UniProtKB/Swiss-Prot annotation:
GO terms for molecular function: DNA binding; DNA-directed RNA polymerase activity; zinc ion binding. It comes from Saccharolobus shibatae (strain ATCC 51178 / DSM 5389 / JCM 8931 / NBRC 15437 / B12). Disulfide bonds: none annotated. It catalyses: RNA(n) + a ribonucleoside 5'-triphosphate = RNA(n+1) + diphosphate. Its main location: cytoplasm. Keywords: Cytoplasm, DNA-directed RNA polymerase, Metal-binding, Nucleotidyltransferase, Transcription, Transferase, Zinc. Binds 1 zinc ion. Its EC number is 2.7.7.6. The keyword Cytoplasm applies. GO terms for biological process: DNA-templated transcription. It is found in: Cytoplasm. DNA-dependent RNA polymerase (RNAP) catalyzes the transcription of DNA into RNA using the four ribonucleoside triphosphates as substrates. Zn(2+) binds at C9, T12, C26, C29. This is DNA-directed RNA polymerase subunit Rpo12.
Length: 48
């Protein structure tokens, strides 16, 4: 399940909510530019 964020109102929504409107638009404000939110990962770097 992918999570997306709107470029205008910054609300997050899932891909099921994205399928409600035709095309790729924010289901809250209708803005066309959306970003896919990455899962927070921790990168461990070994100290020298």
């Amino acid at each position: 399940m992918a999570v997306y964020r709107c470029g205008k109102c910054w609300k997050t929504f899932t891909d099921e909510q994205l399928k409600v409107l035709p095309g790729v638009r924010c289901p809250y404000c209708g803005y066309k530019i959306i970003f896919m939110v990455r899962k927070p990962t921790i990168k461990i770097v070994k100290a020298i």
